[in-house]
């Protein structure tokens, strides 16, 4: 049982969003650092890449427990929560280093891939033993508010984001890095909310915002520099203050779905930093947009 510190840093001014939270895309940049350090400790980082193999994260669950804001200092500790020949489960815990409070938990499913064919490879015995040496206790929350049946198609979904992958957004494998996906999903979320009246003007005037408390991110494919991107989004649930949203990102040239994000969040009172009931008129408009 051995946790490994995999990141230590701070939240910069340009990394906060319009509700004054550490922006989720920059969380994912930190998760990327933590994952790289953890895989390297297991011999599945550059050492594996030099041998024609690489590790890919296919599924990621994130729970946001406490806010991080500009100027906060943070660190991440990581470990293995499960391992077999099909791959690894990695767990990361994000702490506010100033007060020691656990802010975020992340669980990822990673698989070993052949760099040439991009097909899955089994984890060998030595690799599984290295993973077992890094096993940690984990209660990061496998039961999830984002674990719900998803619509089979996009009927009723809205077009919410469209652009092109830039060269500076790709990682060492030549694929779009996780923050590139999250930035687009964040833009898509803003367009979906505006569809029932939660526009930027509404949020400024009412001192309201949208705060995510849980993500489930999946990567069935990948994007590369120059690919055209399209995101379609659907509203799956509306409560008193809570909402559940599904985003699907596709390569606009081929139609291949490359990433999905199931997102749970709340209508937030920015002054009180607490969930606030949706106004009745917005809730009714939102209910008219429900899909699935």
Residue ranges with predicted function:
Residues 1-59, 111-214, 269-292:
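Hot-dog-fold acyl-thioester-processing enzymes
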Residues 3-7, 63-73, 79-150, 219, ...:
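HotDog/MaoC-like acyl-thioester-processing domains
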């Amino acid at each position: 049982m051995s946790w490994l510190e995999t990141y230590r840093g701070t939240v910069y001014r340009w990394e906060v969003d319009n509700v004054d939270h550490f922006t989720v895309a920059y969380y994912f940049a930190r998760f990327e650092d933590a994952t790289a350090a953890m895989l390297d400790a297991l011999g599945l980082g550059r050492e594996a890449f030099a041998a024609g193999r690489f590790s890919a994260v296919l599924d990621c669950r994130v729970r946001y427990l406490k806010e991080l804001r500009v100027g906060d200092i943070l660190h991440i500790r990581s470990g293995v929560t499960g391992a077999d020949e099909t791959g690894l489960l990695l767990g990361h815990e994000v702490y506010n280093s100033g007060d020691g409070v656990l802010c975020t938990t992340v669980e990822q499913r990673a698989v070993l891939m052949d760099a040439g064919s991009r097909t899955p490879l089994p984890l060998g015995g030595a690799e599984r033993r290295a993973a077992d040496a890094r096993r940690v206790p984990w209660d990061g929350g496998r039961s999830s508010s984002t674990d719900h049946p998803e619509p089979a198609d996009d009927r009723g979904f809205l077009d919410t984001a469209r652009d092109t992958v830039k060269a500076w957004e790709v990682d060492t494998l030549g694929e779009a890095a996780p923050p590139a996906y999250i930035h687009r999903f964040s833009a898509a979320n803003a367009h979906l909310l505006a569809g029932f009246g939660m526009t930027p003007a509404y949020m400024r005037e009412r001192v309201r915002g949208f705060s995510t408390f849980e993500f489930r991110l999946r990567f069935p494919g990948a994007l590369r520099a120059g690919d055209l991107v399209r995101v379609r989004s659907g509203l799956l649930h509306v409560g008193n203050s809570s909402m559940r949203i599904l985003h699907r990102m596709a390569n606009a040239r081929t139609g291949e779905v490359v990433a999905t994000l199931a997102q749970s969040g709340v209508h937030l009172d920015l002054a009180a930093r607490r969930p606030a009931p949706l106004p009745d008129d917005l809730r009714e408009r939102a209910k008219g947009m429900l899909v699935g």
